[in-house]
A protein has these predicted regions:
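Intrinsically disordered, low-complexity proline/glycine-rich segments
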Residues: 1-179
Length: 179
C-alpha cells in the first residue's frame, strides 16, 4: 500500500488536495523525540505534513504544518471536561471538536462535531487500533496500525472529495485521546 516511488511524476497534487481515487498517508511518530514531533508521508514516501507537538504546555497542543511551514490546523486538548475532547482550529476558528464516548466497551467511539454543520463518527477496535471514520454511514477514511510492523505508525486512507488535512487532524486526535 505504501510503496516508495520517489520521482514518480504522474500525480503532482499539493498536500491536502484530494485525488480522484482518494489519498493515502503514513503517520510515523519518532520514538523518544522531544515533543513527539513527526512527519506524515504520502503513499510515494514523500513528506507532506509536519506534526509539531508542543512540549511543556499546560494543555496538549499539536500543530499540523505543510512543507513550507504554514500552519494548517492546530489541535488542543480541552482540560476539565466530563469526557476527553480535542478542538481542531484553522486560524482562530474552531472547525471541529473530537469527543471520546464516555462508555464504549471493547470499542473506541468518537464523535467529530463540525462547526460548519453535521458530524463525523469514528469507531474502532481498542486492541487492534483499526478505525473507520464515517459521515452518515458513508466511509470517509480508514485508519490502521495493522498495516505496519513499526510501533506508533498509522496508515490512513482518505476517500475522494474529503478534506485530507482535517481527516489527518482527526487521526492525530484519536491517537492522543486513546493514549
Amino acid at each position: 500500500m505504501f510503496r516508495r516511488r520517489r520521482g514518480h511524476d504522474q500525480d503532482q497534487r499539493h498536500p491536502g488536495e484530494q485525488a480522484g481515487e482518494g489519498s493515502r498517508y503514513l503517520l510515523r511518530e519518532k520514538l523518544l523525540s522531544i515533543g513527539d514531533d513527526f512527519w506524515i508521508e504520502n503513499d510515494r514516501g514523500d513528506r507532506v505534513f509536519h506534526v509539531d507537538a508542543k512540549a511543556l504546555r499546560l494543555r496538549d497542543t499539536v500543530v499540523v504544518k505543510d512543507m513550507g511551514g504554514t500552519e494548517l490546523v492546530k489541535l488542543q486538548k480541552r482540560l476539565l471536561r466530563a469526557r476527553d475532547t480535542m478542538a481542531i482550529e484553522r486560524g482562530r476558528d474552531t472547525v471541529a471538536r473530537v469527543k471520546k464516548a464516555v462508555i464504549a466497551p471493547l470499542r473506541d467511539r468518537f464523535t467529530i462535531e463540525l462547526t460548519e454543520g453535521g458530524s463525523l463518527d469514528a469507531m474502532g477496535s481498542i486492541l487492534d487500533h483499526e478505525y473507520q471514520i464515517t459521515r452518515d454511514g458513508v466511509p470517509v477514511a480508514n485508519i490502521s496500525k495493522r498495516w505496519f510492523r513499526v510501533r506508533d505508525s498509522y496508515g490512513v486512507a482518505v476517500a475522494p472529495g474529503q478534506d485530507d488535512a482535517l481527516v489527518l487532524a482527526v487521526t492525530v486526535c484519536i491517537d492522543h485521546l486513546t493514549d
